[in-house]
């Protein structure tokens, strides 16, 4: 299903994480309510061109969500030819007053002439940006998106394919869903890769997970150009202000830059939605607490990303965990207790990368 301008039902309403030895302690969670809106048609945006710089600004006007939210993650897919880039900004309406515009990132495939970085130092009385996540002090149901198309020296501009808006209310509660047992006993043939197989790979859980999923689609779609090795993904998602490769929208933007592919960040509500994705042939990448996933009682701030590739006959998740120390006998593909994954995933407020072909059908 190619997503158009609408809010998906909670069942598919879909923070930046460091890797297994990194720090993600600010991302702790209670139950929370998510919602997702995908924009693929920007013709209604107000378009303004700066005749001096050649920059083009797209202004969404005020967008109203179906519920009050206090966290927002913006992700995007675009073609950014050499020399071009994108800037994403958001403001919210709080008690009939507009906040300032918060910067949610500058993006470019090639960084020789344009920047690829998150924006630091934005905290004020209304909220803050935690690398890629706008966190408000008070909930709202309205936001405005401002996108700047940054031109190359020859005047060429990037082409925007998709913008995803992932809304979250941290204080809402979501009722658990019954398991989708159709997924039990099913496993997707996602290639296995360890981040520790590469120099500098200790912090590469995110690009390693993206590399595995892109390789899965390369084989399934017979598109070898999608099979990008881990260092290639890491170089293409590096955020100088993180600093590192854990910026969530940067990772999905890398996957979504390929023609016909789509990648975005979102939050889900329940493990049953991971089961639905597996049934539909889409391996989700999820952000988890490494410690809790592997059975420790408490989280030590070690954020991590893994690929959910299936479920056992008894409903335990099967994951491709990129933190595999082959010299110690570790395996990438592992079965983890269902309860461990549920608790570990809650530490990121059930954050997911979804990478799939644009026209791939998924259930709602």
Regions found by a protein language model. Name each.
Residues 1-8:
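Bacterial N-terminal signal peptides that target proteins for export
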Residues 9-18:
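Bacterial N-terminal signal peptides
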Residues 17-37:
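Bacterial Sec-dependent signal peptides at the C-terminal "C-region" and cleavage site
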Residues 25-27, 148-244, 299-301, 312:
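Active-site-adjacent structural segments surrounding the nucleophilic cysteine of cysteine proteases
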Residues 33-49, 64-67, 83, 87, ...:
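Noncatalytic regulatory segments and standalone regulatory/sensor domains
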Residues 35, 224-364:
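Conserved active-site-adjacent core of cysteine acyl-enzyme catalytic domains
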Residues 52-66:
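Short beta-strands within extracellular/lumenal beta-sheet-rich domains
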Residues 68-80:
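A short beta-strand element within beta-rich, extracytoplasmic domains
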């Amino acid at each position: 299903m190619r997503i158009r301008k609408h809010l998906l039902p909670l069942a598919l309403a879909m923070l930046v994480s460091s890797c297994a030895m990194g720090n993600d302690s600010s991302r702790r969670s209670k139950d929370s309510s998510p919602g997702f809106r995908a924009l693929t048609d920007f013709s209604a945006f107000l378009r303004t061109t700066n005749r001096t710089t050649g920059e083009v600004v797209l202004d969404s006007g005020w967008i109203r969500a179906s519920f009050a939210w206090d966290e927002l993650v913006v992700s995007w897919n675009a073609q950014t030819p050499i020399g071009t880039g994108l800037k994403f900004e958001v403001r919210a309406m709080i008690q009939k007053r507009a906040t300032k515009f918060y910067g949610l990132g500058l993006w470019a495939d090639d960084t020789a002439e344009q920047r690829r970085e998150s924006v630091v130092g934005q905290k004020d009385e209304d909220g803050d940006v935690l690398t890629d996540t706008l966190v408000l002090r008070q909930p709202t149901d309205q936001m405005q998106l401002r996108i700047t198309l940054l031109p190359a020296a020859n005047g060429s501009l990037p082409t925007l394919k998709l913008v995803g808006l992932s809304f979250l209310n941290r204080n809402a509660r979501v009722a658990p869903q019954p398991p989708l047992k159709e997924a039990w006993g099913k496993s997707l043939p996602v290639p296995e890769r360890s981040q520790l197989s590469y120099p500098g790979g200790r912090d590469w859980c995110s690009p390693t997970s993206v590399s595995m999923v892109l390789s899965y689609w390369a084989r399934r779609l017979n598109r070898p150009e999608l099979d990008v090795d881990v260092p290639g993904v890491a170089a293409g998602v590096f955020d100088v202000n993180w600093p590192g490769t854990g910026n969530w929208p940067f990772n999905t933007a890398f996957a979504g830059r390929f023609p016909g592919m789509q990648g975005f960040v979102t939050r889900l509500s329940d493990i049953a939605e991971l089961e639905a994705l597996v049934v539909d042939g889409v391996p989700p990448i999820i952000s988890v607490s490494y410690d809790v996933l592997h059975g420790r009682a408490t989280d030590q701030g070690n954020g991590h990303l893994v690929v959910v590739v299936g479920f056992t006959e008894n409903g335990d998740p099967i994951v491709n965990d990129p933190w595999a120390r082959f010299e110690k006998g570790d395996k990438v593909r592992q079965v983890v207790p269902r309860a461990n994954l549920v608790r570990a995933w809650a530490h990121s407020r059930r954050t997911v990368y979804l990478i799939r072909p644009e026209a791939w059908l998924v259930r709602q």
